[in-house]
Amino acid sequence: MIGDSCEDKFTYGTSHRLCPDTPAPVFLPNRDIINFGMAGNVYENLKGFDLKCDLITNSEKIVKQRFIDEKTNHTFLRVDIGDKVNRAGFNPTDIQKQDYEAIVIADYGKGFLTEDDISILCSINDSVFLDTKKTIGPWCKKAAFIKINTPEFEAIKDRIDTRDWVDKLIVTLGDKGCMFMKKEGFNYYPTKKVDVFDLSGAGDTFQAGLVAKYLETKDIRQSIKFANDCAARAVQKKGVVSSL
């Protein structure tokens, strides 16, 4: 597991009035819940699936703090601290193919991994699962599977040759599930309808479920369906979920 990680801090409280000098709610914090976020959340989810894994991530601290109404789960505000980190302090070529059954990359674009770093990682293992905020291109064509979300796909769909991403590209569609690029076009994988309570970390849970099931079955269709189910369960719970 390689990528940018953070501390996900959820501050739950109440708000019953507006500030008298400005139209803003007065928030009274009651409790904090702190989780390992971003690549750290994928890592915790992978361990939750009983996978043995290592984590390579940033040493600098990134904090995402959300102020949330205890009763309604409405988020009043998110405050990000330390949004950028230094480049990874390791040489990607030091990771040997025989050491790992798969490499999972969660690239949140905070500066920990460059395109060159990811390209090297993709070339040294046949099972690289990439989730990236970068614009996909030749640098990541050797990844086994690449997951991006709908806004990221919409931003690039007119600038890429979809034939380059056959049997590789997975686009998540929120509550509609996801789609997987095939030679004849996208295959759609709908998800079951659930009551959405919190979207935090759902993509991380999807990625971990995808990896876990694929390592078990080597069947990407089964893996996508399982990942959809994992994400659907995650959004029904408060905060970042690392154990289903």
Roles of regions detected by a PLM:
Residues 2-3, 149:
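A secondary-structure boundary/capping signal
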Residues 3, 47, 57, 132, ...:
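Short beta-strand/turn micro-motifs composed of small residues
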Residues 4-5, 108, 205:
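Active-site metal-binding loops of divalent metal-dependent hydrolases
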Residues 7-105, 115-117:
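Conserved N-terminal subdomain of the carbohydrate kinase-like
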Residues 16-22, 67-82, 102-161, 177:
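Conserved beta-alpha-beta core of the PfkB/ribokinase-like small-molecule kinase fold
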Residues 31-38, 109-113, 145, 152, ...:
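Catalytic cores of large soluble enzymes that bind and process phosphate-bearing ligands
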Residues 53, 145-150, 187-190:
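Short hydrophobic/aromatic-enriched beta-strand-loop microsegments
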Residues 98-99, 116-142, 155-244:
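Conserved phosphate-binding/catalytic region of the ribokinase-like
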